[in-house]
């Protein structure tokens, strides 16, 4: 009882402190851009409070993503942050559909969890499975309860497919206008896709979920799509600056980005992208974005060559939908300075 009371008092104090309170919805791989996004926020306690981490299928299945998130929390010694496992699958899209699309219209650039065994949960390389387990409450229920308890105060950082969020909106449509804002990585407006030729991965993995969110009445929707993400290029020079500072986090960064994607240790000429880290950085320093525009957007949900593509919204069919602020250009020096600072800090 004392432990429960202390937890309630701590939560109340955090909400009252005036920080930006974030629900962190992720499809985390081993580290990559999702892990970097989490580290950046947790090392910025004066600016944001991470109220909880909800995991969605995308890069990997949700159970594996939860394990990776727990491992990062263990490294950061943040036992108070809870991880909630969300939807087991996208709303409609299946591995069979994805494989058939590849056969019909050409090889897909990236299939994420559709290429993996959903029952296969592995520890991070060189580690054991975390002794912690995800919270017994589901991610969708947690999202709903936090939004209902704190109307107008919650920022959702959505850096994976939007399945969890779409399910929350479908179960409780009234929470749409109680969300302060959603900052998300997903979609592409004027550049090619990175899953199929026309679709960005997060939207492609669950197009129906992305459509629900884009057509919603959430007051503010801020989009970090491929248009801006592909201007934030990581090269080995930036990689070397980070791994030169040895910490458990930079060692994990080195293992993942060095030996997996982009593989800087094997291919020094390789390049990678910061993707989800841009959306997290915006919560800490929005000034690194130098150009944006407002659009009404939708997602194609008819299965075919263009499934998951971002398209203009026909406002006649959805007159209540709120617009999307599409981020377009950035100051990379300012962004990387923030990224480097947070990833190399000593805990």
Task: Please place each PLM-identified region on the residue numbering.
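Sec-dependent signal peptide recognition
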Residues: 1-7
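Hydrophobic h-region of N-terminal signal peptides that target proteins for export
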Residues: 7-16
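Conformational coupling and interaction surfaces
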Residues: 18-20, 38-47, 204-208, 215, ...
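Active-site histidine-anchored catalytic micro-motif
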Residues: 18-71, 76-79, 115-231, 236
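Short, glycine/acidic-enriched capping/hinge loops at junctions between secondary-structure elements
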Residues: 34-37, 64-65, 94-96, 310, ...
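Short, mixed-charge aromatic SLiMs
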Residues: 60-64, 92, 188-192, 298-315
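Short, hinge-like loop/turn segments at secondary-structure boundaries
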Residues: 69-72, 100-102, 239-241
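Surface-exposed loop and adjacent secondary-structure segments within mature catalytic domains
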Residues: 81-130
């Amino acid at each position: 009882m004392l432990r429960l009371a202390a937890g309630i008092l701590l939560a109340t104090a955090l909400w009252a402190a005036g920080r930006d309170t974030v629900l962190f919805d992720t499809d985390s791989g081993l580290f990559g851009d999702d892990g970097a996004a989490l580290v950046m926020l947790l090392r910025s306690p004066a600016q944001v409070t991470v109220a909880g981490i909800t995991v969605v299928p995308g890069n990997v299945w949700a159970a594996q993503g939860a394990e990776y998130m727990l491992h990062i929390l263990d490294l950061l010694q943040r036992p108070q942050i809870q991880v909630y496992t969300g939807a087991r699958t996208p709303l409609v899209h299946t591995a069979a559909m994805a494989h058939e699309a590849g056969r019909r219209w050409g090889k897909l650039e990236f299939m994420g969890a559709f290429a993996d065994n959903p029952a296969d949960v592995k520890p991070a390389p060189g580690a054991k499975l975390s002794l912690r387990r995800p919270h017994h409450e589901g991610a969708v229920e947690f999202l709903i309860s936090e939004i209902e308890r704190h109307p107008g105060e919650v920022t959702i950082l959505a850096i994976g497919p939007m399945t969890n969020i779409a399910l929350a909106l479908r179960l409780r449509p009234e929470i749409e206008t109680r969300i302060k804002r959603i900052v998300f990585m997903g979609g592409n407006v004027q550049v090619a896709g990175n899953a199929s030729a026309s679709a960005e991965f997060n939207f492609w993995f669950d197009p129906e979920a992305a459509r629900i969110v884009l057509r919603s009445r959430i007051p503010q929707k801020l989009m970090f799509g491929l248009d801006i993400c592909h201007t934030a290029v990581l090269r080995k020079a930036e990689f070397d600056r980070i791994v030169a500072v040895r910490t458990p986090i930079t060692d994990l960064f080195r293992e993942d980005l060095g030996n997996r994607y982009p593989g800087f240790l094997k291919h020094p000429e390789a390049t990678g992208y910061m993707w989800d880290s841009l959306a997290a950085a915006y919560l800490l320093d929005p000034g690194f974005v130098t150009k944006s525009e407002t659009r009404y957007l939708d997602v194609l949900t008819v299965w075919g060559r263009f499934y998951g593509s971002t398209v203009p919204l026909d406002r006649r069919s959805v007159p209540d939908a709120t617009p999307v602020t599409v981020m377009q250009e950035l100051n990379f020096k300012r962004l990387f300075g923030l990224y480097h600072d947070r990833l190399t800090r000593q805990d």
